[in-house]
Each structure stands twice: as structure tokens, then as C-alpha cells.
Amino acid sequence: MSLCISDYLYLTLTFSKYERQKDKRPYSERKNQYTGPQFLYPPERIPPQKVIKWNEEGLPIYEIPGEGGHAEPAAA
């Protein structure tokens, strides 16, 4: 949709007046939108299989917890 402002200048509207409407619900209803069983408790974290430590050269060294050994270093 274009509006003619002068003989050579047109104002182009890139959105509809119906797209940008104020949410007319009260605050209590908008707040309750993000409550429920899927938002109450965060999911359980997956325990890490490797621990990343950095050496003096700035390269990562992967250690497997519990074994104390080193995994293969990262490829450069």
C-alpha cells in the first residue's frame, strides 16, 4: 500500500494496521500464559561424559570423569 505525500514522494507502508494491535487482555491473563506443567520445572540436566581442561597452549584436553585418564585431544 502506498500513500502519495507529494507529486514525487510516496510513503510505502510495509505492515497492516491489524498486525500491530495492543494486547487487550489484563496483565493477570497475559502473565498466566507462560505458566503450566511445561514451564514450571526445568528439564533434568544430562550429566557430562567428558571434562574439558585447557593446557598452556590454549588447546582443550578432554578427561573422562572417574577414570582420571585422557581422551583423545581435539583436532586442529
From Swiss-Prot:
Highest taxon, organism lineage: Eukaryota
UniProt KW Ligase keyword: no
Propeptide stretches in the record: 1-14
Induction: Constitutively expressed. Not induced by bacterial infection.
Annotated GO biological process: defense response to bacterium; defense response to fungus; killing of cells of another organism
Keyword Membrane found: no
Alphabetical keyword list: Antibiotic, Antimicrobial, Fungicide
Role summary: Displays antimicrobial activity against the Gram-positive bacteria B.subtilis ATCC 62037, S.aureus ATCC 15752 and S.mutans ATCC 25175, the Gram-negative bacteria E.coli ATCC 27325, P.putida ATCC 17426 and Serratia sp. ATCC 21074, and the fungi C.albicans ATCC 10231, C.neoformans ATCC 34881 and S.cerevisiae ATCC 44774. Does not possess hemolytic activity.
This protein's name: Antimicrobial peptide lumbricin-1
Organism (species): Lumbricus rubellus (Humus earthworm)
